[in-house]
Amino acid sequence: MAEVANNEQQGPQFNIQRVYTKDISFETPNSPAVFQKEWNPEVKLDLDTRSNKLSDDVYEVVLSLTVTAKNGEETAFLCEVQQAGIFAIAGLTEQQLAHSLGAYCPNVLFPYAREAIGSLVSRGTFPQLNLAPVNFDALFAQYVQQRQAAAAEAPAEEANA
């Protein structure tokens, strides 16, 4: 009983057990010709997060970033990084846990992924690429709103069928 009471008094717990690169790729499909052209790139960033439960209160979160730089119609480089972390998270409500996995953990992982991308781009001898910070809290809130809107539409569609 004392142990259970002790755990309840501790409240929410969040520990980073490990941060690691799960997958990494850098491609320059049009080299060396791309280096001889005027550099005026259009850079596109795509990102995604996913999580899975490894055991009780232990989760893996993977932040996937894909950066594509096009110089005119040609792809100058394509850089993909999957930055992952193992997190011990306990004492949270379901909603708090979802926010932690969908926003807080990606916030922890993003600087590592940004550094990996910057390093890869630099090693490819392209000009330095500094990715702007990402507001994962806002992205998660948008995701929750979209899911709620989709859930509200689903019963309406069933009623009309």
Swiss-Prot record:
A Pfam family the protein falls into: SecB
SUPFAM superfamilies: SecB-like
GO biological process, alphabetically ordered: protein folding; protein tetramerization; protein transport
GO cellular component, one term: cytoplasm
InterPro entries the record matches: SecB, SecB-like_sf
UniProt keywords, alphabetically: Chaperone, Cytoplasm, Protein transport, Translocation, Transport
GO molecular function annotation: unfolded protein binding
Subcellular location, record wording: Cytoplasm
Complex and partners: Homotetramer, a dimer of dimers. One homotetramer interacts with 1 SecA dimer.
Its job: One of the proteins required for the normal export of preproteins out of the cell cytoplasm. It is a molecular chaperone that binds to a subset of precursor proteins, maintaining them in a translocation-competent state. It also specifically binds to its receptor SecA.
Family: Belongs to the SecB family.
Protein name, UniProt field: Protein-export protein SecB
Species of origin: Shewanella pealeana (strain ATCC 700345 / ANG-SQ1)
Lineage: Bacteria, Pseudomonadati, Pseudomonadota, Gammaproteobacteria, Alteromonadales
Gene from which this protein is expressed: secB
